[in-house]
Structure formats: structure tokens, C-alpha cells
Amino acid sequence: MCIRDSFYDEVLAVLGMSSMYEDEVCIGYAHEGNPDVEFYITQPANGEPVTFGNGTQISFLTKTKEQVEKFHQIALGLGATNEGNPGFRPSDSNAYYAYIRDPDGNKICAYAYQ
């Protein structure tokens, strides 16, 4: 499949997700032990080049702040850019976030409640 690369395979593995479905135009990821796909990467149906959305963000709820930190670390090691270091936001809340932009420019967030 032409859109497959190891970035999402490795980053989503931190969250307990793996590819569960793949065909000529898309790949779907689900949590281990659950056959329901929660995240798809697809080629545009209109045949135009892939672009990222301005003002869009994909967020993944994790179980622990350690998963958030590992997600951030692995993503940066695979070529993502930092959009926000792991930390509580706001600083006095129980919500722990980290933000990256994947190699294509999509803004991705991993977060956990502690």
C-alpha cells in the first residue's frame, strides 16, 4: 500500500493500537483485542494530493501520562516536530497533554487524565 509507513505503526503501538485493516486506499488502526477500527489513514477520494487541515487536530486518549511521554518521544524520534512538550494543561488540572506534528504536518495530541 502506497500510504503505509512505519511512523503510525510505531507511534500508535505506544497507545496499544496496531493496524487491523488495510486495502489499496486506506489503513485502519484499532486497540489490541478490539476489532473496531478507531483511526484511518486514507488516500483522498478526489485524487488530489494529501494535505493537512488548518485548525484540525487528532487526539488520542491514553491510560497514563507515561504513555503520553513515550508517544511524544517516539514521534519526535521518527521525524515529527514538537508542538507542545508533555505537561499538565492548564498547569493546575489533571489533564496531561503532548502535541506533535507528524511528518506530513498533521497536528496530533496524546493525553491522559491523572
Language model: regions and residue ranges:
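Conserved small/polar residues in nucleotide/adenosyl-binding loops
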Residues: 1-6
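Acyl-CoA/ACP chain-elongation machinery
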Residues: 12
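Conserved short beta-strand elements that form part of the metal-binding/catalytic scaffold
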Residues: 15-52, 108-112
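A broad, low-specificity signal for short, low-complexity segments enriched in glycine/proline
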Residues: 16-23, 59-61, 71-72
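Short, well-ordered turn and helix-capping elements at secondary-structure junctions
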Residues: 43-45, 86-90, 114
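Short, solvent-exposed beta-strand edge segments and adjacent coil->beta transition regions
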Residues: 53-57
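Vicinal oxygen chelate
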Residues: 60-104
